[in-house]
């Protein structure tokens, strides 16, 4: 199944490159790619320099394929039961990512979300929409379109491809909505061992 999905993704990428990203069928273009890799605990140990190099490598791997949006999320929390990330560590992680993002260049819009619990995030987004005082319609009706827009923001299109760094037996806990209609590709390699060559292999 994974091989078949990857073959379909490759075919779509080749068509997008051959036509310069232009096609009569919008479904043939990869507009949004999600990469789920590493645990939140591993992310915390990443320096600003490592984040800069990692994000730049990701952009360089997907940009030639015409990708407009790249979202990066952890696979899981990586913490033992009862173990949590401290506020100081979370603040340091957010700062490292923000500083690294300033050095990312290219035509791809990059979104990095450090939340590892996709179900918790889903509930928080739903509650936020229902309690939105500026939108009276949200109190009575919550449409699929509004929910998708809030979950994917600032990206404005559903993911076409989800690349998971890890074995195909483990789905990312950070993704709930994004995997429903996306093609899944698994690359069984650790976060710290990931290189630009691995990313190129995954999307080539």
Each language-model region and where it sits:
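Flexible, compositionally biased loop and terminal segments
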Residues: 1-204
